[in-house]
Amino acid sequence: DSAPVLEPTVFLVTLHSMSSPDEIFHIADDAAFTRTALEVFHRQAAACVPYREYLTRIGVEPEQVRSPEEIPFLPIELFKTHDIYCGETPPEAVFTSSATTGMTPSRHPMQSLALYEQAFRAAFRTFYGAPEHWSLYALLPNYLRRKGSSLVYMADRLIADCGSGGFYLDDYEALLEAMARDGKPKILLGVSYALWDLAERYAPKLRGTVVMETGGMKGYREEIPKEEFHKI
């Protein structure tokens, strides 16, 4: 099976903008989502200077935005050149993207790591249930070789919650041996090019395993359409 990876850092930009961040974990219907999305938008438009300037440049008046569909997205390039942050206290951590060689990484200040953990743990339980019922194996070589990865931070905490699994840098054989011995349902979280290498070199039969793909090819292999990649 395959599943999309959780991407909580973008979600946290929203959480940090709420007057009561815990509210977002209790959205139960479309009306509540719309109300919360507009609250977040108006607070960011007022408190986040780069976003406010962007809205001015594209001619958007915040008071005229009346639905989530009308909320402008901030171009990802600005996360490389500006501090996109509207917390009232300094961030506890600053996560960085895994930029391709020679490119500038984007930066994601996190006001609260506890809130970040609450977000990805809630997302995990929503899609997969109790973590202790799973083993989480992480094949994230390029992420482990650098500092500041929100994905590694998330995987490390979820592996601890699961109580089994672990990180594997480039040791595919050790990974497959550990998974073969593991009787629990498994999640294999891997960057795209490493999963491709694993499939090409070993053609493993991953029974009882959900494959969670993330990250793209990172310059290690050619980029191909997702539909074609998932057939590999």
Placement of each model-derived feature along the sequence:
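N-terminal amphipathic/basic-hydrophobic helices that include classical n-h-c signal peptides
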Residues: D1-S17
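Active-site glycine/GP-rich loop and adjacent strand/helix microenvironment
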Residues: V13-L15, S19-I24, A28-Y51, H133-S135, ...
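Residue-level preference for long, well-ordered alpha-helices that form the structural scaffold
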Residues: D29, F33, P109-Y116
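Short, charged/polar micro-motifs that form catalytic or ligand-binding hotspots
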Residues: F41, S106, M110, P141
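Active-site diphosphate/adenylate-binding microenvironment
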Residues: A46-T96, G102-P109, Y116-E117, R121-E132
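Poly-acidic low-complexity segments
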Residues: E61, P75, S112, L169-Y172, ...
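Internal, well-ordered alpha/beta segment that forms a basic, Gly-enriched binding/recognition surface
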Residues: T101, Y116, F120-I159
